[in-house]
């Protein structure tokens, strides 16, 4: 058995921290875990993605068409993940847009959100989209977006990690003074999404 997660967004959204929490939780549950990360630009706003693979896997790169779950912190980055998605993939999408630097100077406009979601729905098994930034702000801080997205992922059918293991990994990897906000964000994300 294997399970593949593709996490994508832009620098500064907490993609790598989220992936580290997932990876540690999987190891704590006794799973074989491999992870890779790609930084587009080494600054806020550059594309960032990670690939996390659990179980009977040999390499850290998810083969085309084999991602079981895509956690997209930014809608356009979700579109870029299309080749990684399996036909049955669950896609979690934060609808808050952060246009990439190369699009700002491009003659091509940022696609309408409705078109992005429609394209994802045509290519994946399940798509759940919501304004994660709004939920993070309501939880106490916009920088808790990554925990909103983690909570949403944990609510999906087939997600292989338990809530308690994820929370323990959060406690090991996040500042204690922000734990209350991050836990609230995690639970709000969990309640927002249910891919069944």
From Swiss-Prot:
Keyword Membrane included in the entry's annotation: no
Pfam families referenced in this protein's UniProt entry, alphabetically: POR
Activity response to pH changes: Optimum pH is 10.0.
Catalytic activity: indole-3-pyruvate + 2 oxidized [2Fe-2S]-[ferredoxin] + CoA = (indol-3-yl)acetyl-CoA + 2 reduced [2Fe-2S]-[ferredoxin] + CO2 + H(+)
Keywords: Oxidoreductase
Keyword tRNA processing on entry: no
EC number: 1.2.7.8
Temperature-dependent activity: Optimum temperature is 80 degrees Celsius.
Protein name as annotated: Indolepyruvate oxidoreductase subunit IorB
Upper taxonomic lineage: Archaea, Methanobacteriati, Methanobacteriota, Methanomada group, Methanobacteria
